[in-house]
Amino acid sequence: MVQDRKVLDALDTAKTQWYHFTAVVIAGMGFFTDAYDLFSISLVTKLLGRIYYFNPASKSPGSLPPNVSAAVNGVAFCGTLAGQLFFGWLGDKMGRKKVYGMTLMLMVICCLASGLSFGSSAKGVMATLCFFRFWLGFGIGGDYPLSATIMSEYANKRTRGAFIAAVFAMQGFGNLTGGIVAIIVSAAFKLRFDAPAYRDDRAGSTVPQADYAWRIVLMFGAIPALLTYYWRMKMPETARYTALVAKNDKKAAADMARVLNVELVDEQEKAAAATAAAAEEEAARREQYGLFSREFARRHGHHLLGTTVCWFVLDIAYYSQNLFQKDIYTAVQWLPKADTMSALEEMFKISRAQTLVALCGTIPGYWFTVLFIDIVGRFAIQLGGFFLMTAFMLGLAVPYHHWTTPGNHVGFVVMYAFTFFFANFGPNSTTFIVPAEIFPARLRSTCHGISSAAGKMGAIVGSFGFLYAAQSTDPSKTDAGYPRGIGVRNSLFLLAGCNVVGFLFTFLVPESKGKSLEELSGENEMEAEPAAATNSYRQTVPDSGQSE
């Protein structure tokens, strides 16, 4: 239908404006909160073990039993997976805006509830913590398809990749803030309630007030989400959803007039009657295939396979490293042995290590993607990222014993940081961006939800599997309660193999740089464009300014 074609053309050629940047902040703050909530748990798991699983007869500080640790670390991912599928589907059925506020409020409530976890026993506290973190993950899951879809549908085609990447890049600041908050909280508590090392005083090394420290860290995640709730509710529905799915061209153009300087003119009213028949015919053609149809499989089946597999294997590698950075640091002696520190000191040093990696390896990679994705393209960045991640992981794994010898620990951390850099300046960003671009509008949120859910399945495999796989091959050196594993070195080989799989499946995903969403999804092929309405719309800014 020509009206929505004109709406979409106006969106694709619209000049980059202030509202685009506002949308990045509004959508990006959700990802800031997402990253903070998902990664902050790794900063406090050692502290949880010391508080709730203390054994005065043990020579080592208390630690979470394997099943409890797996649940605490992985339950939010289970919720995220479910949320991605549910809210992705709901975003296509009800509209992006209507669902957007639900996810944010769920995140706020469950952030606060996680910090208020209660119970008369250690199991009780862990059970309530896991319950609230599951629903926290459920809300976080909804943010993935909705934020990506909203940003892709607002942006013009020349800078669309950079804007979606900027939304995702807020994860880096979420990680960094998680580390900074944990550093401040642990340092403040340590200053006020200093304690001896565990080997000097087993019971006294964990002060009772430490039970407040982890709660404060988890609850802080509610603040940025709460601050952006009002602005999310003020965002209009995306014009692409209104025009292509709700089929209300007049409202789509009116919404654009509010935020993107594009308005409806009287001629549209005159053209509406003349194009009604064409609109009905086109609508019927658009609805001729659904997600599970042969036509979808023919047009987009290989695309969906590529996006899901790439995100799945990427998250196995990415999240297993992120969640267990502290274990790798300990293995190379970058962190002191646990019994030489008090509980709060251990939390401080774990947080400091994660903050350093976020600052040096994580954040730069995200913003390199923002700068180069509309120049180099999605395909090249993803392919190169998988290749270099493989190379650096093999560089860590092959001479692993060299890296663990005295004097080489800094080199290990540098290599490890480069692995994160090329994950973020690579597939960790592009696997989020591409599914928001290549599928039809009526299935865009659903397909992004499916792709991101595959990623979270990989995160579950990484977070649960790595707990066991990375244990030492020497039974005497495993963590309490864990069976013998394959060791960190062999685990790195496995993760490198995952990256090779991602490299190969990248070839199923099309390049989307510089193309309109309708061109990528094939919706252009199904459009009838009556000549009578070619001038239905006009832009309020001069044509000469629409070069971005």
Swiss-Prot record:
PROSITE patterns found in the cross-reference section: MFS
Sequence ranges on the Cytoplasmic membrane side: 1-23, 91-98, 145-163, 232-303, 377-378, 427-449, 512-548
Region listing for Disordered, in residue ranges: 518-548
InterPro entries given in the database record: MFS_dom, MFS_sugar_transport-like, MFS_trans_sf, Phos_permease
Extracellular compartment residues: 45-69, 120-123, 185-210, 325-355, 400-405, 471-490
Residue intervals passing through the bilayer: 24-44, 70-90, 99-119, 124-144, 164-184, 211-231, 304-324, 356-376, 379-399, 406-426, 450-470, 491-511
Membrane topology field: Multi-pass membrane protein
Coiled-coil ranges (or none): none
Keyword Cytoplasm recorded: no
Tissue: Expressed at low levels in roots.
One term under GO cellular component: membrane
Pfam families linked to this entry: Sugar_tr
Record GO biological process: phosphate ion transport
UniProt keyword annotation of Membrane present: yes
Function: High-affinity transporter for external inorganic phosphate.
PANTHER family named among the record's database cross-references: SOLUTE CARRIER FAMILY 22 MEMBER (PTHR24064)
Protein name per the record: Probable inorganic phosphate transporter 1-5
Protein's organism: Oryza sativa subsp. japonica
Gene assigned in the entry: PHT1-5
